[in-house]
From Swiss-Prot:
BP term (GO), one: regulation of ARF protein signal transduction
Domain of life, per lineage: Eukaryota
Keyword terms of this UniProt record: Guanine-nucleotide releasing factor
Pfam families, per database record: F-box-like, Sec7
PROSITE patterns: FBOX (PS50181), SEC7 (PS50190)
Any Gene Ontology CC annotation: ubiquitin ligase complex
PANTHER family referenced in this protein's UniProt entry, alphabetically: F-BOX ONLY PROTEIN 8, GUANYL-NUCLEOTIDE EXCHANGE FACTOR
SUPFAM superfamilies according to UniProt: F-box domain, Sec7 domain
Name assigned to this protein: F-box only protein 8
Role played: May promote guanine-nucleotide exchange on an ARF. Promotes the activation of ARF through replacement of GDP with GTP (Potential).
């Protein structure tokens, strides 16, 4: 009751002062329009520094294309970057819209080489009727086939003349692409040790700290989930390659491939110990130094301590 009387008195007071509801709505509408104009002015000021790109993105060939950016009006580098995120199916759909881009061989060549860095066919005289657009589709098809059956995938690449029947060429192809499923790749390399040998030699570990080099190695050649003969083979090949890339360091530290092999196993075990939530009592730095120097003699205590610090700070070497 008291609140109702207060509103009546307040309304009478406002009317005496010249207030009206219609006048309030008119003033509120004017205020919002002024705020909108200020916002638009600020937006134009923000884009003024990049006015060329702004107008490129806003340009349209016709009203039917409103809201649809034409890649043909963008710089070639920007168009290439956008298209590189599309898969083969989406690229085919995009080529139906952008006819000029669909027939641009330089664009398709860039897409091929950015996704599959090495193919034997790159270094050959192109056959009659060759196009990089067709090659891109074949590379995509072959990669999908490999991810279902590695042997059939490699045979597909060879049948299309994309890869030569050479372990070194296959190793280069694997090393320069990330489209292959790592589980299928691990099975293939376990069966094709000749390809594995050439793949290891493509790595350059010069002047790299041992744990960092091991991480890079396992990023390209994934470690098996369980300990076994294949893991031993990988570590053995890595140890010899690491020593071959760092002969001066090996002489300075007095390390041999066998000693590096022991250190690699120690790093893997330490990685599991420090990162596994199931291990409650973590290995201390002193314990790691003692155990490692017991297995591999003549190794500097400081060097082994730096190995521990690297795993503790950065993490697993084979994650």
């Amino acid at each position: 009751m008291g609140q109702g009387l207060w509103r009546v008195v307040r309304n009478q007071q406002l009317q005496q002062e010249g207030y009206s509801e219609q006048g309030y709505l008119t003033r509120e509408q004017s205020r919002r329009m002024a705020a909108s104009n200020i916002s638009n002015t600020n937006h134009r000021k923000q884009v003024q520094g990049g006015i060329d790109i702004y107008h490129l993105l806003k340009a349209r060939k016709s009203k039917e294309q409103e809201g649809f950016i034409n890649l043909e009006m963008l710089p070639p580098e920007l168009s290439f970057t956008i298209l590189s995120y599309l898969n083969a199916t989406d690229l085919c759909l995009a080529s139906c819209v952008w006819q000029d881009l669909a027939n641009d061989e330089l664009l398709w060549q860039g897409l091929c080489k950015s996704t599959w860095g090495h193919c034997s066919i790159y270094n050959k005289n192109p056959p009659l009727g060759f196009s990089f657009r067709k090659l891109y589709m074949q590379l995509d098809e072959g990669s999908l086939t490999f991810n279902a059956n590695p042997d059939e995938g490699v045979n597909y690449f060879m049948s299309k003349g994309i890869l030569d029947d050479s372990p070194k060429e296959i190793a280069k192809f694997i090393f320069c692409t990330r489209t292959l499923n790592w589980k299928k790749l691990r099975i293939y390399l376990d069966e094709r040790r000749d390809v594995l040998d050439d793949l290891v030699t493509l790595h350059n570990f010069r002047n790299q700290f041992l744990p960092n080099a091991l991480r890079e190695f396992f990023r390209h050649i994934h470690a098996p989930e369980e300990r076994g003969e294949y893991l031993e083979t990988l570590i053995t090949k890595f140890s010899h390659r690491f020593c071959a890339c760092n002969p001066d360091l090996m002489r300075e530290l007095g390390l041999s491939p066998d000693a590096v092999y022991v250190l690699c196993y120690s790093l893997i075990l330490l990685s599991i110990d420090l990162t596994s939530p199931h291990v409650k009592n973590k290995m201390s730095k002193r314990e790691f130094i003692r155990n490692t120097r017991r297995a591999a003699q003549n190794i500097s205590e400081d060097f082994v301590g730096h190995l521990y610090d690297n795993i503790y700070l950065i993490g697993h070497v084979a994650a």
